[in-house]
Amino acid sequence: YAMHLLRTQDTQHVRVHPDGEHGKQFDFAAWLLRRDFIKISSIGTTSYGGTYRNAAGQEITVNPKSGLGDVVAEVGNHVISAECKGGIINTRHSGQVSRLYKGLCETVGMLMATPSQGRQVAVVPLTEGTRRLAERLAARCALAGIEIALVGARGEVMDVKPAGDNERVTGRRDE
């Protein structure tokens, strides 16, 4: 979702705050390097914590510190804060499908329990089930100031809008 914000919002800097387990399971440095981001400074004691910059001057800071929002960007004079939950998306196993459902509910709940600094977005993997649930939740979430975004297997991001909006689901591909 951090790459999506860099591509679609008027910002040059996005902060990512992974929890400890996410940092152990995901190679942030290699993933950013494949996207032409070079590490320019270090933060904390992890090998991946630090600020990364690409040739266009865009920066991603990876700081494994909890309580700050999973992905945060300042856009103009407001803040976009996203809570993200991952999961296995190419499965029909009932336990995994249930976990994806719970992940969406959990991200919405986390955002509701956090004071809003600006736009709040619940971000989960795109599956048929999460799309249906997101469409059902979208209107109530909008009343609470929470947006829902679903991320597909290839990085495409779909913003789920409440029924009645002109465009219910909008898709943008982010590789």
Regions found by a protein language model. Give the residues of each.
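Nucleic-acid nuclease catalytic cores
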Residues: M112-E156
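Conserved catalytic or regulatory cores that recognize and/or transform ribose-phosphate-containing ligands
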Residues: G69, V79-I80, A138, V169-G171, ...
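Active-site-adjacent loop/helix micro-motif of nuclease/hydrolase catalytic cores
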Residues: I89-T107, T130-L133
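Polybasic (Lys/Arg-rich)
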Residues: E147-E175
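Active-site metal-binding core of divalent-cation-utilizing nuclease and nuclease-like domains
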Residues: H13-I89, L100-G103
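Hydrophobic anchor at the start of a short beta-strand
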Residues: T8-V14, R119-V121
